[in-house]
UniProtKB/Swiss-Prot annotation:
Short name of one Pfam family: ABC_tran
Lineage: Bacteria, Pseudomonadati, Pseudomonadota, Gammaproteobacteria, Enterobacterales
PANTHER family recorded: GLUTATHIONE IMPORT ATP-BINDING PROTEIN GSIA, TRANSPORT ATP-BINDING PROTEIN
Gene Ontology molecular functions: ATP binding; ATP hydrolysis activity
Residue positions binding ATP: 49-56, 357-364
GO BP annotations, alphabetical order: peptide transport; transmembrane transport
Keywords: ATP-binding, Cell inner membrane, Cell membrane, Hydrolase, Membrane, Nucleotide-binding, Repeat, Translocase, Transport
Statement: the UniProt record of this protein carries the keyword Metal-binding: no
Record organism: Shigella flexneri
Entry similarity comment: Belongs to the ABC transporter superfamily. Glutathione importer (TC 3.A.1.5.11) family.
Gene (name only): gsiA
SMART domains, A to Z: AAA
NCBIfam families documented for this protein: PRK10261.1 (NF007613), PRK10419.1 (NF007739), PRK11308.1 (NF008453)
Membrane disposition: Peripheral membrane protein
Catalytic activity annotation: glutathione(out) + ATP + H2O = glutathione(in) + ADP + phosphate + H(+)
Protein name (record): Glutathione import ATP-binding protein GsiA
Amino acid sequence: MPHSDELDAGNVLAVENLNIAFMQDQQKIAAVRNLSFSLQRGETLAIVGESGSGKSVTALALMRLLEQAGGLVQCDKMLLRRRSRDVIELSEQSAAQMRHVRGADMAMIFQEPMTSLNPVFTVGEQIAESIRLHQNASREEAMVEAKRMLDQVRIPEAQTILSRYSHQLSGGMRQRVMIAMALSCRPAVLIADEPTTALDVTIQAQILQLIKVLQKEMSMGVIFITHDMGVVAEIADRVLVMYQGEAVETGTVEQIFHAPQHPYTRALLAAVPQLGAMKGLDYPRRFPLISLEHPAKQEPPIEQKTVVDGEPVLRVRNLVTRFPLRSGLLNRVTREVHAVEKVSFDLWPGETLSLVGESGSGKSTTGRALLRLVESQGGEIIFNGQRIDTLSPGKLQALRRDIQFIFQDPYASLDPRQTIGDSIIEPLRVHGLLPGKDAAARVAWLLERVGLLPEHAWRYPHEFSGGQRQRICIARALALNPKVIIADEAVSALDVSIRGQIINLLLDLQRDFGIAYLFISHDMAVVERISHRVAVMYLGQIVEIGSRCAVFENPQHPYTRKLLAAVPVAEPSRQRPQRVLLSDDLPSNIHLRGEEVAAVSLQCVGPGHYVAQPQSEYAFMRR
């Protein structure tokens, strides 16, 4: 039955009275209630709200993916205008018909790329599969188009990446592959669920511009789900604000930012961290917590000094980590990824040192190498006077009680067969620290500290939103009262209010227990708020390191200035520069086996502030 007369000529999507529920303990739990919206051709609708507000399940309902997970979906109308201009009712489509709609007419970029990519197929095969299915292209044509899409999302060495597997890529690289796959068939509607969460600010800025360019070319409608109000200001035409499963406010981006009507919208905007807010302050500062009842922003008191003078708790010297690349008929190692090259730094008790840089710069690999989750090929890692890099497996296991890791992808780091209570208790059991009754009380306390309920201990990972899963991972890392926590994008998946709560929790624990943090992040506004010192990484090497004040208020290296300039600002009227989207000029950290890369030489430009020397900087930036 044709539905063209039911959809306005300019619209590509219309939803009326969408209701979503899940069954739990024989009870129906409502996730979304009476949600209605439309999307015009060439328009970007941003759906914003806290974790668990119903944003992602709304997107999954549109894609007809919720029924498989036990979701109950009811809707008066869910109309889509396909690329062929035919209008279909999505709720009436069979599973076979939806397979032709997904990808070709409506594509989705998922929040967690590691769980969305198939680990047994190469990147090229996965992108090409979608192109062959929906565009009737040959294998050769599909691979050429796949390479072109990787170029468009600014992946260096795109030809090489085509033959790599998802586990061989960084989180940001995987997210860019997901974006390339979703855009490869030029759909009528693109649903982007936190598509730039795992990306550094420079790549995020380029991806946002890329989506806008392709949107203009194809008159594509975009639903952009995010918690980053800076991104909303940069990309959205209209904004839909959700709270506890309901739409509380909708309007143009200018109306929402300049004249918000609902208290929750005002609270969301007040909670956005602003780059430059820490100017003149020496120590990290807690985030102001905004609630629906008290939306007015009140700055928290200034923090006290937590860094303990004396010997560093962690000392890293000339750390080198490389990954082999095989090729040829004999599958020999011919090239290597120089992920980390001669990195050195110290970390003191009670200090937060942030590692920042683009995806693939070596931040996460550095963090993993410290715990020997990846093996290093050179350098020294010393914890409390003891060499980590030479420890036996048995002694290393005991040491991991004192150094904990919070991973970037929360779903991939939780066992789907275990309740979250069991996942949090597991490290306590492994180290024999607490009996069952005390361990259960510890789990309840940890869940409350990260903003969850004690009864959540009996649920499984798939029953939580992405932000809630990240909070579970943080609770697990805190279970053993470690001396050092390596946090790899630990708050990147969280909305602004929960992110503030978690950062405040980390600062409280640092103040109470003297925990040292190695904070790996691409969110410069959060880094500015939490850090004592900042190290900027580029192609596996540190090019600038110093106090937070020095790096943010007086950046010396061109790359540091580039990172700061790319940070999205929560002001829709701000003029934004156009960015070049070509990837041919991107440098690469892949080199022939045995080839040595010159280490940058750092020079002191101020107290504790070191920057790559100009003579080595030019060669380094060009490589």
